[in-house]
């Protein structure tokens, strides 16, 4: 089996209808699985930033980047190595919390620095923002209480330091 690597790509694209479809279609046609995808308008409304997380065979990383760069709507693509990127993700999670368990659930929520968003009769909903690894650990802990449902935003990332995507060659 080939050496699979998780890659974090940041793409600056024109903010136009159909761009997301073209990027997703490229990944689907090539058989690349998208683990996480976030898209949002940038500081300039004419552009959007896509953060694409994918598990790719190591030798295909540059190929994926070249294929993305060839799309007309894509202005620039950079590979955000973990050490060179600021990453964050948001989790909303609803867990079972009967009266006898509420203190334990709240203690777990507080120990991770999460926020309580809602308390129902039998559930507690919390929000946690942080690295994907922190989100994963929190989910593991909350699983002991019984997860009703959860939603993850997907990873969003920027290059660390002073450079920005427009300056990267």
Language-model segments: residues:
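Long, contiguous binding/interaction regions
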Residues: 1-49, 53-169
């Amino acid at each position: 089996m080939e050496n699979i690597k998780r890659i974090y790509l940041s793409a600056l694209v024109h903010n136009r209808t159909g761009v997301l479809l073209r990027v997703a279609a490229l990944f689907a046609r090539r058989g690349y699985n998208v683990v996480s995808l976030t898209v949002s308008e940038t500081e300039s409304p004419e552009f959007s930033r896509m953060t694409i997380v994918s598990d790719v065979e190591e030798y295909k990383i540059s190929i994926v980047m070249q294929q993305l760069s060839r799309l007309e709507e894509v202005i620039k693509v950079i590979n955000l190595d973990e050490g060179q990127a600021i990453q964050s993700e948001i989790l909303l999670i609803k867990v079972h919390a009967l009266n006898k368990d509420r203190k334990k659930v709240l203690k777990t929520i507080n120990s991770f620095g999460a926020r309580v968003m809602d308390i129902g009769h039998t559930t507690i909903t919390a929000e946690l923002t942080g690295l994907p690894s922190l989100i994963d650990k929190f989910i593991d802990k909350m699983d002991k209480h019984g997860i009703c449902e959860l939603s993850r935003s997907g990873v969003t990332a920027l290059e660390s330091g002073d450079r920005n995507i427009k300056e990267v060659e």
